Amino acid sequence: KWDMNRIFSDYYSKNLPPERQGEMAHRYVCGLYHCMRELTKRFPDILFEGCSAGGNRFDLGILCYFPQIWASDNTDALCRTQIQYNYSYGYPLSCISAHVSASPNHQTLRNMPLETRFAVAAFGNLGYEFNLCDLPKDEFMAVKAQIELYKKWREVIQYGTFYRRECFDNRNSRNHGVLNNGAGNNAS
């Protein structure tokens, strides 16, 4: 994961005159793309994951180098419904990294069932963000079953046609689904 956890607040350079200070953000992006082009050329077998946090690097250009992007450092399942839903307006589910994290969530302290956390993370590039060795046997087996289910439906989820249904209470509800449009699903 290529991360830059830094907020851009100092868009200036001592080396540029005042009338050219507006170039800093653009120069940063050009430099980052150059760096990523070289890295992916030198190491074509490494899957680099980008990160939108800090440097706000989730755009169509960066997808040339990072086929998947960590959409937010916030891993709370309820918060992620909004984050992933909004990203889906501009990006395919296949590039949105989404993880099942521990409960209670370390950021919001919210308790969510494992099934809920999986259901949210499954609408993206699924991962798990906790130590599997720490799980009770029943949860470990549930995670194993979730991964098998995801693998069965991964192509449909990532490459099918994504539909959103607008809800009356848009603040607390998300309703969406994926239709198999010949995406190569081997599921029965």
What are these regions (language model features)?
Residues 1, 11-12, 130-131:
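Extended hydrophobic-aromatic, low-complexity segments
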Residues 6-33, 78:
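Aromatic- and acidic-residue-enriched carbohydrate-binding clefts of CAZyme catalytic domains
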Residues 9, 13, 20, 40-47, ...:
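Hydrophobic alpha-helix feature that most strongly marks membrane-spanning transmembrane helices
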Residues 115-167:
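Catalytic cores of secreted or luminal carbohydrate-active enzymes
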